UniProtKB/Swiss-Prot annotation:
Coiled coil: 172-204, 241-278, 305-454, 752-797
Keyword rRNA-binding: no
Domain of life: Eukaryota
GO cellular component, one term: membrane
Full protein name: Protein NETWORKED 2C
Disulfide bonds: none
Annotated stretches, region: Disordered: 108-141
Any one GO molecular-function label of the UniProt entry: actin binding
Length: 848
């Protein structure tokens, strides 16, 4: 990436030479315009021989040509603007070069007319100009003495004369201009490097963005498929839960990014330390060289001195981290706002890292340049013993300025590194504070289950009665402890204010631990509980060590304590699972015993029923003749009832057919009426209305027949109802009489059986009568609708049943006999007229 930045440092020079092979934009535009011109020529070459081709050329190809002209104008406009911009830049560059290097102005003028694509170095230009500017022998003697004087002047004198004649627009001398150009080029290089770093981070962030977007789309598709599969609606997440989830995710992302930036900072610090060692070595060499050359002991041996820090970085940040932030985070939305500020701080930190990387890269290059100059000066000192002290002093002064410049860059790197450390520490403090505050707010709004999962040490004895989600305990405890350890390792000074509270918490934890162990011994009496009780002595020793250590390493001790409690919890949960399985086995055994008892009881009931049926059948064999006669009547009524149900179901099913047929005809009729209102032609639509009219008349006739049959069925049902009531009265009277006549008397079982069958038939008969009456009402309503529809059709389209029949039965006169006056042949009698002569007699008067 640094090589790419170095290669792009002078890209402005090559971009100024706008040529076809070097400008990708211009080449693409030329290819695009060439393709468009070819397409436009093809459109213009077509000849409109027919009207269709001319219409196509006008309506289809004319807009294409117009769009081609517009696009060509836009392309020309863009090309002209780019040319105008580049010409201004070239003009400014030429004026600057002419003011700084006046002797190379003719060479650049020649380069403008050169058509070669490859850039030519200044050496080649000088060789070409020197070869081309060789003076030739003049044909005539020179009359102008000034011109002759200039011919014999040296080139250096001519250049000095031209330089003195040119006025500098910038107001700078040649050396100042060179220094300014060098400075600007270095700044450009730094900006190019920083740009490459920012570009790389942007590309990485963009790739991660699209990866997350793809993951979101996949999960959303899975959610949609599951909702469609199980017919579940969208699950609405509560605002508070959504804010907590988003805040937790943002804090996790910030934590990962801060860890990554912390690693980068450590790497940058190592690189800066290496660079500082090189600076100290170079300054020492420069001091020895200056002592050897000047001998006055004025060399600057102590170039770099590290700035003493009066206050630690943590104390500075602690002063800045005000208590107002803690007071302002009272609700979850306030915490969300603070998290947004933390995200902005992390983004600013990334920008600071990119600028720091550019400065470190510049520092390396300056150190390498300084080393090269010191080596060159040492070689020059060893090779030639010169007496020119002024020249050597000038070089040493330049070298000292170079060293001071490197020191300034190093100081700038150090300040930026301190600033980054300060921002990193503050971001870590914000992260730890916001994470703790978010957890405290979530714990306040939750029930006792969440409190128990977050504080598992306080009540271990209740583990046998309550079920805790294992995953929640592991996640909350481990993440909380990891975050506490990280924040404590990074910000140590924050623990000093909390030492008293920590000691109190540890004392409370020891008491709760002892109480929990005693409760655990009371509640758990299985062999597995020995594993927990054997750890009591080790836990007491551990608590003593925890109190002895004090604040240092309390997070590690608490983490180990939490892991032990979780281990105990898992063992207790395992014991509970085993007891549950035992209870399930006992319950299954009890259920099996109950099933066996139910089976035995059912067998006893079946035996009693068989005995009762045997007794009844024994009584049935001794039935009287009147009972047999009444039983035969009841059986006949049952068969008639079954036949009646079949007839009723067949007739009742036709009601739905009538309804659907009339609805369909109504729909078709409405379409025809709508078409009539739109077109206004009655004769053209009469042929479409006739089949509807005929079909509706047929349905009306069928409904009339159905009504007649249904009325007969209704009378039959009424007769059956009276018969059933008579039989029911006979049975009840026979059961009530206490006469000694054996012909009339019934047994209790047989009388109850006859009475039940007759009552069931009466209920069925009443239900059929009600449904039949409903069907009659519905068919009557349908007949009225059909009559109104037929009347409406006959009025609007002049249709009637007599007209249709007469038009069909009217004897038609052939067209041939009408024209040529021929008598038609006698029509033969059809088979239907022979079979039914009465129909023809009825139709004749209707037609007449």
């Amino acid at each position: 990436m640094l090589r790419r930045a170095a290669s792009n440092a002078y890209s402005w020079w090559w971009a100024s030479h706008v040529r076809t092979k070097q400008s990708k934009w211009l080449e693409e535009n030329l290819q695009d315009i060439e393709e468009k011109v070819e397409y436009a020529l093809k459109l213009l070459e077509d000849e409109g021989d027919s009207f269709a081709k001319r219409a196509e050329m006008y309506y289809k190809r004319r807009p294409e040509l117009i769009s081609f002209v517009e696009e060509s104008f836009k392309a020309y406009r863009a090309l002209a603007e780019r040319y105008d911009h580049i010409s201004k830049e070239l003009q400014n560059a030429n004026t600057t070069i002419a003011s700084v290097f006046p002797d190379q102005v003719p060479e650049f003028a020649m380069n403008e007319d050169d058509d070669d694509d490859a850039p030519v170095s200044p050496r080649h230009h000088k060789n070409k100009t020197s070869n081309k500017n060789v003076p030739k022998v003049p044909d005539l003697p020179i009359k102008d003495p000034e011109a002759a004087k200039k011919m014999f002047m040296s080139r250096k004198a001519i250049q000095e004369q031209n330089a003195s004649s040119v006025v500098n627009k910038s107001g700078l001398s040649k050396t100042e201009a060179v220094e300014e150009i060098d400075k600007l080029q270095k700044e450009i290089l730094v900006l190019q490097t920083e740009k490459e770093f920012v570009k790389t981070s942007y590309e990485n962030g963009l790739a991660k963005y699209w990866e997350i977007e793809k993951c979101i789309m996949e999960k959303q598709g899975k959610v949609s498929s599951l909702q469609d599969e199980f017919d579940e609606g969208a699950v609405v997440i509560e605002d508070k839960e959504a804010q907590i989830l988003m805040s937790t995710t943002a804090l996790k992302s910030c934590q990962e990014k801060l860890e990554e930036l912390r690693d980068k900072q450590e790497q940058n610090v190592k690189e800066v330390d290496v660079s500082r060692k090189q600076i100290s070595e170079s300054t020492e060499e420069f001091g020895n060289l200056s002592d050897a050359l000047l001998g006055d002991g004025k060399g600057n041996h102590e170039i770099y001195s590290e700035k003493e820090k009066l206050e630690s970085l943590g104390e500075k940040v602690n002063d800045e981290f005000d208590d107002s932030e803690a007071k302002s985070c009272l609700t979850i939305p306030d915490v969300a706002d603070k998290i947004d500020e933390l995200v902005n701080d992390v983004i600013n930190l990334e920008n600071l890292f990119s600028s720091q990387a550019a400065l470190i890269h510049r520092l390396r290059e300056e150190i390498d340049d300084l080393k090269a100059q010191i080596r060159a000066l040492q070689k020059e000192n060893n090779s030639s013993q010169t007496d020119d002290n002024m020249d050597m002093g000038k070089k040493l002064k330049e070298m000292e300025e170079k060293v001071n410049g490197v020191k300034d860059i190093d100081q700038e790197v150090e300040e930026k590194s301190d600033n980054i450390d300060k921002h990193l520490t503050r971001a870590h403090m914000k992260l730890s504070f916001l994470s703790k505050r978010l957890k405290s707010l979530t714990q306040e709004g939750e029930d006792e289950e969440l409190k128990a999962t977050n504080v598992p040490i306080q009540d271990i004895g209740s583990l046998t009665d309550t079920k805790f989600p294992e995953e929640n305990i592991d996640d909350t405890v481990v993440s909380e402890n990891a975050l506490d350890i990280k924040s404590a390792s990074e910000v140590v000074f924050a623990e000093k204010d909390l030492s008293d509270e920590v000691n109190q918490e540890e004392a409370i934890e020891t008491k709760t631990k002892e109480a929990s162990l005693s409760d655990l011994e009371k509640h758990i009496s299985s062999p597995k509980s020995d594993i927990i009780t054997t750890q009591e002595s080790s836990d007491e020793l551990f608590l003593q060590k925890l109190l002895a250590h004090g604040i240092e390493g309390r997070e590690k001790h608490l983490l180990t304590e939490y892991t032990k409690v979780l281990r105990n919890y898992k063992e207790v949960k395992k014991l509970l699972h085993e007891t549950e399985t035992k209870l399930k086995n006992v319950n299954t055994l009890k259920d099996e015993g109950k099933d066996q008892q139910r089976g035995q009881l059912f067998m006893l009931i079946c035996r009693e029923d068989n005995n009762a049926t045997n007794a009844i059948t024994g009584q049935k064999q001794r039935m009287s003749p009147n009972e047999e006669q009444l039983g035969a009547r009841v059986d006949a009524l049952l068969s008639e009832n079954l036949n009646l149900l079949v007839r009723f179901s067949n007739s009742f099913g036709k009601i739905q057919q009538f309804d659907t047929g009339i609805k369909d005809l109504h729909g078709e009729m409405l379409k025809i009426i709508k078409q009539k209102n739109q077109d206004g032609g009655k004769n053209t639509l009469r042929s479409n209305v006739r089949p509807i009219y005929k079909h509706l008349s047929e349905i009306r006739t069928e409904m009339t027949v159905w009504l007649e049959k249904s009325l007969l069925l209704k009378e039959e049902i009424n007769i059956r109802a009276s018969t059933l009531s008579d039989i029911h009265n006979e049975i009840t009277e026979a059961l009530k009489t206490d006469s000694e006549d054996s012909e009339i008397k019934f047994t209790i079982y047989q009388g109850a059986k006859f009475e039940g069958e007759v009552s069931n038939m009466k209920k069925e008969n009443n239900r059929i009568a009600e449904e039949l009456q409903t069907g009659l009402d519905q068919v009557t309503k349908l007949m009225k609708d059909a009559d109104t529809t037929l009347e409406k059709l006959s009025e609007e389209f002049s249709l009637s049943e007599s007209n249709t029949q007469s038009s069909q039965d009217r004897s038609r006169i052939p067209l041939r006999s009408f024209i040529f006056d021929r008598k038609p042949k006698k029509q033969r009698l059809s088979l239907f007229s022979c079979i039914q002569p009465s129909l023809s007699k009825m139709k004749k008067p209707a037609g007449s």
